[in-house]
Amino acid sequence: MLMIARKALASAHTKAFRLATRDVHCFSSILVSPPLVSLDLPENWIPYSDPPPPVSFETEQKTVVIDGNVIAEEIRTKIISEVGKMKKAVGKVPGLAVVLVGEQRDSQTYVRNKIKACEETGIKSVLAELPEDCTEGQIISVLRKFNEDTSIHGILVQLPLPQHLNESKILNMVRLEKDVDGFHPLNVGNLAMRGREPLFVSCTPKGCVELLIRTGVEIAGKNAVVIGRSNIVGLPMSLLLQRHDATVSTVHAFTKDPEHITRKADIVIAAAGIPNLVRGSWLKPGAVVIDVGTTPVEDSSCEFGYRLVGDVCYEEALGVASAITPVPGGVGPMTITMLLCNTLEAAKRIFL
């Protein structure tokens, strides 16, 4: 019996591996992106204490503001149509499970927006909330339940987790075919390797590329700089841009003269999480800037007592960049929309 159980387990692992490595990245008509052709040291960025002098150029660049809300809405309209077709064909809809630990204000806001987006597009959503002091065992128990639930096609663990929890161990518990956040090591690894295709690409990088393409920005052959190298955005962003044939440089907290390197870029992806880190003087005139940063900064004049600030000094970038995403209203809506797309694709692999 033990031998049979071991063979069954080996067979299951083999099946999961084959799923991860074969070409199953099903691009529907929803997105315009084409098919995909030690970092443990702390990132201690040192932001400017005083703003640098204003940058002036002989001719001021007219900057296009890339509206992520409009582009996200176009994609969501198609998602609604696809979900409707699925429901009519098989009587089922995609299902997304979200695990939220603790009561961190920004995490609650992000989860609330994701649940709302599911409701608006016809995707079923289930929210599991656990206390700040919960154990890894409690979270893993919830994940196992969702892994076995056939009505759930995507599972998302809202990050960051409390410090006493092993983030890698918890994320690795999500079944590969339900890893709609694209954080599983096999998904990231297959993104990095030629001849391999991940089941899912991380939502924020995927949304950034979609924004670039829909704005008419050519990626192939361009010099791109990614500022930040987190597992969530920076690292997969660099890998994805390489898949689109960009020449990619990564700038991080240990980079010498980051301004000089960034100023060579045709495309700048700012994902360091440091408000106003990238000044106008960092940018090459005509560069396209995608600002991933969304740091909450206290502001009593705002409804919730804070406002979101990007990594790029927006006012200084205007007139230098040829195009830029605002914060908020740029990358954020696209990240959630790519989560919906990944959940839909996960369900399609089961039903269609």
Curated annotation (Swiss-Prot):
One Pfam short name: THF_DHG_CYH
Sample GO molecular function, one term: methenyltetrahydrofolate cyclohydrolase activity
Disruption phenotype: No visible phenotype. Fold1, puru1 and puru2 triple mutant shows no photorespiratory phenotype.
Annotated EC: 1.5.1.5, 3.5.4.9
Keyword Endoplasmic reticulum: no
Catalysed reactions listed for this entry: (6R)-5,10-methylene-5,6,7,8-tetrahydrofolate + NADP(+) = (6R)-5,10-methenyltetrahydrofolate + NADPH; (6R)-5,10-methenyltetrahydrofolate + H2O = (6R)-10-formyltetrahydrofolate + H(+)
Pathway stated in the Swiss-Prot or TrEMBL entry: One-carbon metabolism; tetrahydrofolate interconversion
Cell compartment(s), UniProt: Mitochondrion
One CC-aspect GO term: mitochondrion
Gene Ontology BP terms: photorespiration; tetrahydrofolate interconversion
The UniProt record lists the keyword Oxidoreductase: yes
Subunit structure, as described in the record: Homodimer.
Similarity section: Belongs to the tetrahydrofolate dehydrogenase/cyclohydrolase family.
UniProt function note: Catalyzes the oxidation of 5,10-methylenetetrahydrofolate to 5,10-methenyltetrahydrofolate and then the hydrolysis of 5,10-methenyltetrahydrofolate to 10-formyltetrahydrofolate.
Stated name of the protein: Bifunctional protein FolD 1, mitochondrial
Taxonomic source organism: Arabidopsis thaliana
Gene: FOLD1
